[in-house]
A protein has these predicted regions:
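Hydrophobic alpha-helical transmembrane segments
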Residues: 1-62, 100-213
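Basic, amphipathic juxtamembrane/active-site segments
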Residues: 72-114
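Active-site His/Glu-centered metal-binding helix of metallohydrolases
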Residues: 66-74, 87-95, 124-127, 131, ...
Length: 213
């Protein structure tokens, strides 16, 4: 999935709300998104003993993602877009990733080693994109695991896990191997996240090589 490349198509859901919040400090909206991301991670961590929290956590992830997109739209419409705001947004995004993915990683839904690999994949994906910009190459959103993709997957898989528990199929069984549905999401983050990081690294290297020719 490459939902980050489709960001412009979400304007219909952002612009009307952004216009109503045009007098609100965009940084305040960023803080709300970060707090919601922390809450979602906490809900996922606690959800093994209360599976309904999976649904609540999924909803909170979606709302957090909405606020994450809304702050930039408000800043743009209000003429308050700045490098400081962009920097704060990137920092908060990384903390949000850690909160949301970390909540699953340390929960009983996930093998801790898999959780660690998923976090590495997610953080390296974002790092390789911003590091490209830091060295003077174009900022990269390329790959199969952008921020928007993570938000959508972190909304869908908790719902799948909840439905699986209710129907009596909490795991995907392959022979003697049983994997929670939430772990499938984490496997995707671990594998595709690191592949996306490598892909972005290769693209940046090629871009920098062209500049040096």
């Amino acid at each position: 999935m490459v939902l980050d490349s489709q960001r412009g198509k979400a304007d219909f859901a952002l612009t009307p709300v952004a216009k109503k919040l045009i007098n609100v400090n965009p940084n305040m909206i960023s803080w709300i998104g970060l707090i919601l991301a922390f809450l979602s991670g906490l809900l996922f961590y606690l959800s093994y003993d209360g599976t309904y929290l999976l649904l609540v956590g999924a909803a909170v992830v979606l709302i957090s993602g909405y606020f994450d997109a809304l702050d930039g739209k408000v800043a743009k419409l209000a003429g308050k877009a700045s490098r400081k705001g962009d920097y704060l947004d990137h920092v908060f995004d990384r903390y949000a990733d850690i909160f949301m993915i970390g909540g699953v990683a340390i929960s009983s839904w996930c093998n801790p080693y898999l959780g660690m690999l998923a976090l590495v994949g997610v953080l390296l994906t974002s790092y390789m994109g911003t590091q490209a910009q830091a060295v003077g190459a174009p900022r990269l959103y390329a790959g199969l695991l952008g921020r928007a993709d993570r938000v959508i997957l972190s909304t869908i898989f908790p719902i799948i896990q909840y439905v699986g528990v209710v129907l009596g199929y909490p795991t995907l069984d392959i022979g003697d191997l049983s994997i929670y549905w939430m772990e499938i999401m984490m496997i995707w983050f671990a594998v595709v996240g690191n592949l996306t990081a490598i892909q972005r690294g290769i693209i940046t290297w090629k871009n920098l090589s062209k500049e040096s020719e």
